[in-house]
């Protein structure tokens, strides 16, 4: 989804500036062992009921890494049953002190930190993202998000209300119950943490379906959940496909809430399934076509760099990617030249090499989808300025691609490509670019680059997006809410707002013989 709070990490001079040099990063494990390939239900490793398995593929080579259990509806039923039992009144989990839930989450964070190199290596192997980003960005965020919500566990509570009459009134923030969670493949461990941490901090139990493209790191984290001491049934991890296992979670009558991160198209299906079943609570973090707007007074070098990383970070596989770059007419030509040169300099290659900036797309389907959009952009009349083809002969690599002369009615201007393709647009006036930026079904993020504070503040109010960045991009921390307007989803993850999605507010009113202030 995004680049976390490490704004200098991906700078021109040092992509590993949080460490003194690339040499300061630990060496990756090039062939990590794969100890877990079964479903994790009730703190036990189990085969799928059907005994089916499916392959997980190394996108760097296109070769099969191994096979994992293919869970489906029957396995979801088993997992939901375990989660419901763990959530019953009087269970060890329900009777556990909130501070103890926080201690378990902190313990989990410690275990992730202990195994950080292994987990980062596993993420790079299965997902294809550069190891230095897996280690320095993703794992850093994972550890922080578990610790952040651990701190909230005994601080998220109700309040007393001075209501009229002879009554004493207070509210309780209670866990919703069994939470179904469906996570994507672009940030497997991060998305797992974004969803697990607030759910567990507030006392829920979880049935999680992980992406079929990237199951390995999530399964290993399940082993750490057991090692940390979470009771059986509190967390259950299912590997399988969306139309079977994912749909079973969304439709399940004994799942109280579903949280999904992924495409807007699937988000519609999740919302419908929730409505057609038991009206379960729904949180959706979906797609985007986010604008980056560069005004003529912007710091040119900085804006070029930020807009480049806004799009190309994580191989363009971010829902909040800055996938529409609007540049004021008077600086458009210079910005375009610098942007093309920067894209040509981006190092594509083996993600285990510490100076690699761009790895492969996650799988063959995404690889072909992105190449299809590149061909479509050329057919529609956009000018291909660099890239536009595969890189190398093995794996799913695509050269960084920049289009100029893009028009708003082109499909590459309207649809989420989810790959390393940067379309550039020209604009003349502020009101014009605001209208064009907002003319989209999406509303996840936006950015504006300017030295004029008044203009910056005006844009932050005018842009229809859940997050607006000024003179930066992709800066997200566990402390700040993240989510979208319009068809980019509903609800928020992270921060204090992220806790609201996992609790019900109960009002308790007691008649008293006499009320005194």
From Swiss-Prot:
- Name of the top EC class for this enzyme: oxidoreductase
The record's section on CDD domains has: ALDH_F1AB_F2_RALDH1 (cd07141)
Tell me the GO molecular function terms.
aldehyde dehydrogenase (NAD+) activity
- Quote the catalytic activity from the record: an aldehyde + NAD(+) + H2O = a carboxylate + NADH + 2 H(+)
User: Which GO biological process annotations does it have?
Assistant: ethanol catabolic process
The Enzyme Commission number assigned here is: 1.2.1.3
Compartments reported by the entry: Mitochondrion matrix
Report the residues modified as N6-acetyllysine: 51-52, 364, 383, 399, 414, 426, 429
Transit peptide span, please give it.
Answer: 1-17
Quaternary assembly: Homotetramer.
* Purpose of the protein: ALDHs play a major role in the detoxification of alcohol-derived acetaldehyde. They are involved in the metabolism of corticosteroids, biogenic amines, neurotransmitters, and lipid peroxidation.
Record-given protein name: Aldehyde dehydrogenase X, mitochondrial
Q: Which gene encodes it?
A: ALDH1B1
């Amino acid at each position: 989804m995004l680049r976390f709070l490490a704004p200098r990490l991906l700078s021109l001079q040092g992509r590993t500036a949080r460490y003194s040099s690339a040499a300061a990063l630990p060496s990756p494990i090039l062939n990590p062992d794969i100890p877990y390939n079964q479903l994790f239900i009730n703190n036990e490793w189990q085969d799928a009921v059907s005994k089916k398995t499916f392959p997980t593929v190394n996108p760097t080579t296109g070769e099969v890494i191994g096979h994992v259990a293919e869970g489906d509806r029957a396995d979801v039923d088993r997992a939901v049953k375990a989660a419901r039992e763990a959530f019953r009144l009087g269970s060890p989990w329900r009777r556990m002190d909130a501070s103890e839930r926080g201690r378990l989450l902190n313990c989990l964070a410690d275990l992730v930190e202990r195994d950080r190199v292994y987990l980062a290596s596993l993420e790079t192997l299965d997902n294809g993202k550069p190891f230095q980003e897996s280690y320095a960005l993703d794992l850093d965020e994972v550890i922080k998000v578990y610790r952040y919500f651990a701190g909230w566990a005994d601080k998220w509570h109700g309040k007393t209300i001075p209501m009229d009459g002879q009554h004493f009134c207070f509210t309780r923030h209670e866990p919703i119950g069994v939470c179904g969670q469906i996570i994507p493949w672009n940030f497997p461990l991060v998305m797992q943490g974004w969803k697990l941490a607030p759910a567990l901090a507030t006392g829920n139990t979880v049935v999680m379906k992980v992406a079929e493209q990237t199951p390995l790191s999530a399964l290993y984290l399940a082993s750490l959940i057991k090692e940390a001491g979470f009771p059986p049934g509190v967390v259950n991890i299912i590997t399988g496909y969306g139309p079977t296992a994912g749909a079973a979670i969304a439709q399940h009558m004994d799942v109280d809430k579903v949280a999904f991160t992924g495409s807007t198209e699937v988000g519609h299906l999740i919302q419908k399934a929730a409505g057609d079943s038991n009206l379960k609570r729904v949180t959706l973090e979906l797609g985007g076509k986010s604008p980056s707007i560069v005004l003529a007074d912007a710091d040119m070098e900085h804006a070029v760099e930020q807009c480049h990383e806004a799009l190309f970070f994580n191989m363009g596989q971010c829902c909040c990617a800055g996938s529409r770059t609007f540049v004021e007419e008077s600086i458009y030509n210079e910005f375009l030249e610098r942007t093309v040169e920067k894209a040509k300099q981006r190092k594509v290659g083996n993600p285990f090499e510490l100076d690699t900036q761009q790895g492969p797309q996650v799988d063959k389907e995404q690889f072909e989808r992105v190449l299809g959009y590149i061909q479509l952009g050329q057919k529609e009349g956009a000018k291909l300025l660099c890239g536009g083809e595969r890189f190398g002969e093995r794996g799913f690599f695509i050269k960084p691609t920049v289009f100029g002369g893009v028009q708003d009615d082109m499909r590459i201007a309207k649809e989420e490509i989810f790959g390393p393709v940067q379309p550039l647009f020209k604009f003349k006036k502020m009101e014009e670019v605001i209208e064009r930026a907002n003319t989209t079904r999406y509303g996840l993020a936006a950015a504006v680059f300017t030295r004029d504070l008044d203009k910056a503040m005006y844009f932050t109010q005018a842009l229809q997006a859940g997050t607006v960045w000024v003179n930066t991009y992709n800066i997200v921390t566990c402390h700040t809410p993240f989510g979208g307007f319009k068809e980019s989803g509903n609800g928020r993850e992270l921060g204090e707002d992220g806790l609201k999605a996992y609790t019900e507010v109960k009002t308790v009113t007691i008649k008293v013989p006499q009320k005194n202030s």
